[in-house]
Amino acid sequence: MLTNSEKSRFFLADLTGEVQSIPNTYGYISNLGLFRSAPITQTTFLMDLTDWDVSLLDAVDRDSRKAETSAPERVRQISFPMMYFKEVESITPDEIQGVRQPGTANELTTEAVVRAKKLMKIRTKFDITREFLFMQALKGKVVDARGTLYADLYKQFDVEKKTIYFDLDNPNADIDASIEELRMHMEDEAKTGTVINGEEIHVVVDRVFFSKLTKHPKIRDAYLAQQTPLAWQQITGSLRTGGADGVQAHMNTFYYGGVKFVQYNGKFKDKRGKVHTLVSIDSVADTVGVGHAFPNVAMLGEANNIFEVAYGPCPKMGYANTLGQELYVFEYEKDRDEGIDFEAHSYMLPYCTRPQLLVDVRADAKGG
């Protein structure tokens, strides 16, 4: 395809197409299907927390009238405000009139093309915002990109945060003991009426932690043994082998001791230009190596009540007191046929009902 050259309008050059530069959207946590959708009809919601008193029974004389009794359940209530997001986009005649479609020599752009790009931009912004909020919920807090704290799940549920130090800079570190500590904590603190059994423990870690873990002298051989296609199939039951069949290689995933370690490099930029690294711990340097552990209960489907995301109704008359949806997008024509406005609304709040199962991991030694 020929078009005018940059050097002179009297010369021609080939136009080969359009190259779009789009920031990464990541989405690992969203793709897990970890958070169960829980639509509500209001913009705030309450949650009752019931503590059961379950203890062993003492034997009594069958001829006596003595019997065991249980203490009544203790019930308390906590509240959560919903987070509201609104995005506005517009199409004006100036975006269409005389505008060449990128990647073409002389084709004019169309309203349909511009509309599709606007809607894709809205959806992408929503998706990365939701991924950011999901990751914050896995850290035990409900916080937006500005740093506004809506809820500290540890304080709300009256539990303490657990941190496990792997001491990966020490060649003699007992990594098996650290993993066992993690697994036992999950089992002891689940409080679901049963143990965490069959649910895979996920640990999303940053690049530094993953590198230190897989290069540790006690771990290196186990990691290398998993990098062959046959080993991967035996471990996961998947026929995907990596680069040979066009599927992303699993070089950043490592199973060990019943735990799945995944290197997650997700990061997003907010409107102020600040970059938010998803796998991070406040006040901990990025040279330390950190991660966040949680039980992957996605396979439970609707039975999963550990990770949920509440969606509230759109602030429009026709949607008052109706069950909320993930995202509402409305299209309005401007007065005097001067363009089109798009409005996107979302009330949402991801949360964890058992934040004691959210564990931070660090590559350094405790007190280091």
From Swiss-Prot:
Q: Which InterPro entries match?
A: Major_capsid_GpE (IPR005564)
Q: Which GO terms describe its cellular component?
A: host cell cytoplasm; viral capsid
Q: Which UniProt keywords apply?
A: Capsid protein, Host cytoplasm, Late protein, Virion
For the keyword Lipid metabolism, the answer is: no
One Pfam family hit? Phage_cap_E
Domain of life, per lineage:
Viruses
List locations, semicolon-separated. Virion; Host cytoplasm
State the similarity comment: Belongs to the lambda phage major capsid protein family.
- What's this chain's function? Assembles to form an icosahedral capsid. The assembly is primed by the interaction between capsid assembly protease and portal dodecamer, and major capsid proteins assemble cooperatively to form the procapsid with the help of capsid scaffolding protein. Major capsid protein forms hexons and pentons of the icosahedron. Viral genomic DNA is packaged into the procapsid through the portal vertex. The packaging triggers a dramatic reconfiguration of the capsid shell.
Q: Which HAMAP family match?
A: CAPSID_LAMBDA (MF_04133)
Q: How is the quaternary structure described?
A: Homomultimer.
Q: Identify this protein by name.
A: Major capsid protein
Instruction: Output the lineage of the source organism.
Output: Viruses, Duplodnaviria, Heunggongvirae, Uroviricota, Caudoviricetes
